Amino acid sequence: MGSDRWKNIRGTPQMEDSVQEKSQRKGCGYILCTVLLSVAVLLAVTVTGAVLFMNQYHAPSTEPPPVITTNMEDPNALVTIERADSSHINIFIDPNCPDTFPRLEGLQSTMLSALADHDSEQKMAGGKERALLTSLSDQVAQMVSQVARQRADWENVKKVQNGLGTEIGALKNEQGRLIKLLSEGQSHVAQLGSSVSEVLETVQRELGSGRPRLKADLQRAPSRSARPRGCANGSKPRDCYDIYMSGQQEDGVYSVFPIHYPSGFQVFCDMTTDGGGWTVFQRREDGSVNFFQGWEQYRDGFGKLTGEHWLGLQGIHLLTMQAHYQLRIDLEDFDNATAYAVYNTFGVGLFSVNPEEDGYPITVSDYTGTAGDSLGKHSGMKFTTKDLDNDHSENNCATFYHGAWWYRNCHTSNLNGQYLRGHHASYADGIEWSSWTGWQYSLKFTEMKIRPQREEN
């Protein structure tokens, strides 16, 4: 199609030359005929006037007037006058047209010049058009090439996309498989952790009741059974049991002097419950003391000995290092119902060279009582406060349950929790003993106290 148009463009000037030449010839013919006709008319009028003039000034004649006609027989004669005597007068026009043809030639030259200029302009316009067509053709070729490249790029992108889709599908399948394996692994780890915890509890029970106490025995003073009852010979009482055995059997505040702390400190002694001689180290009864304290307070103790108080981890450790102690916990709810739990083996930091660095771990086993065992699962755990997290939970159990305790992950008892007065909407953040009242009942009264095991008396 482009080549046909190119041929048409190239053939256009020749056709225009032929048309222009024909137009020039036709124009010259019209002008020549017009001039000749004008001259003929003028001559005819002149001849007619002359004849009339001659007729006017000569005697009238009986001869008929001359007849003026165009001579069709002689193509060179413009007009023929036939006289009365049948003679003819032919009027000719010089075919060279001496005055008209130069002007016609000038006009023709002007027209030819104009036509030449017009042809030149058309040729110039045709050249510009050809240049424009060439430029457009180049641009179209470039665009076609670019489209072809883009199409090829798009095909490559589609291939890459398909490959990525396949790889992503494979990765998703692998991810699902790994998630399944991880879930199974977590389940196995949880089972293993539970098994290990049970084994540790068993070992701790054995340690608490048997040979591992040897290390603690080596750090203790001579056996209590070797010392006379009543602290004879001026010896100082090591705990409330010594005071009870010396004859003082009224409840109250007394001074005790543990073997490894000869300067001593004061404690509250329960001389009436289950045979007396109990050294109290924790009491909750009215909510008058804030038990949501930090590490230093729980290490050193706080509160009032005759009311709500915590003796202190250091004091509990010093007492339980002297002999084999048992723990008694008395509980009371807001309906005045009571229950108790006794652990025949109890100690804090028994096997620690530096108990504070070790977190004052608890050893407790051999439960009996009516409240249910809500402390045995805490055996072996370090003490946790709101500012020192020693538990196994991702969160700080002391902060989460608003207390301080030997938390594991997190608790089955929380006797240092908030004093919430019975049933509460929050979960397990009151004074809880879950095996007796569940996790949403805060007890009215609790008391934790220790005494040497009776077989050592």
UniProtKB/Swiss-Prot annotation:
Pfam families: Fibrinogen_C (PF00147). Residues 231-454 form the Fibrinogen C-terminal domain. Residues 1-21 are annotated as: Disordered. The keyword DNA-binding does not apply. One of its GO terms (cellular component) is collagen-containing extracellular matrix. InterPro entries: Fibrinogen-like_C (IPR036056), Fibrinogen_a/b/g_C_1 (IPR014716), Fibrinogen_a/b/g_C_dom (IPR002181), Fibrinogen_C-term_domain (IPR050373), Fibrinogen_CS (IPR020837). NCBIfam families: GGGWT_bact. This is Fibrinogen C domain-containing protein 1-B. The record marks Y401, H411, Y427, A428 as: Implicated in ligand binding. Disulfide bonds join C240-C269, C397-C410. It comes from the Eukaryota. Its main location: membrane. Ca(2+) binds at D389, D391. GO terms for molecular function: chitin binding; metal ion binding. The chain crosses the membrane at residues 34-54. The gene is fibcd1-b. Coiled coil: none annotated. Glycans are attached at N233, N336. It is found in: Membrane. It comes from Xenopus laevis. Residues 55-457 are extracellular. It is a single-pass type II membrane protein. Acetyl group-binding receptor which shows a calcium-dependent binding to acetylated structures such as chitin, some N-acetylated carbohydrates, and amino acids. Residues 1-33 are cytoplasmic. Homotetramer; disulfide-linked.
